[in-house]
Amino acid sequence: YKDSLEAIFENHNEMLAQEFVEGREFTCGVIEKEGMVTSLVATEVILTKGELFDYEAKYSPAGCEEITPAQVDTVMMSEIQNIAMTCHKILGCRTLSRTDLILKGDRLYVLEVNTSPGMTKTSFIPAQAQVCGYSMKELITILIDSVKYSR
């Protein structure tokens, strides 16, 4: 890693680095429905190829396994959902967000909050919404109404 750091500092004055946290990976969508912030169910992401959830792992058929809802107990599911909703509120997100987390031991780490998550038929949000009982049409209607509601 020393060579990489030196190469970075040859061209830049600043760098942001963070600890690598290894553990189970989860992602959890949040929507706003009738003015209320509501969590969808969490998905567990299990890499089947490679060590990172990169473009290839995300979009190739054998890159990862997505388990929706995540196979965790109700306490852990609630904790993941509450963290996702808290992140959504604290960061001032509107309408839709998705929070990615790592579970290491018994501690959850927030990796990032995505304020423009994918909405394709293979994306996390539609799969999570379906488990919560929303069709894609209903989900889109909720999102559109949420924008109208916030005005």
Please annotate each region the language model reported.
Residues 73-151:
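ATP-dependent carboxylate activation and anion-phosphoryl transfer catalytic cores
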Residues 1-82, 108-109:
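Phosphate-binding site of ATP-dependent enzymes
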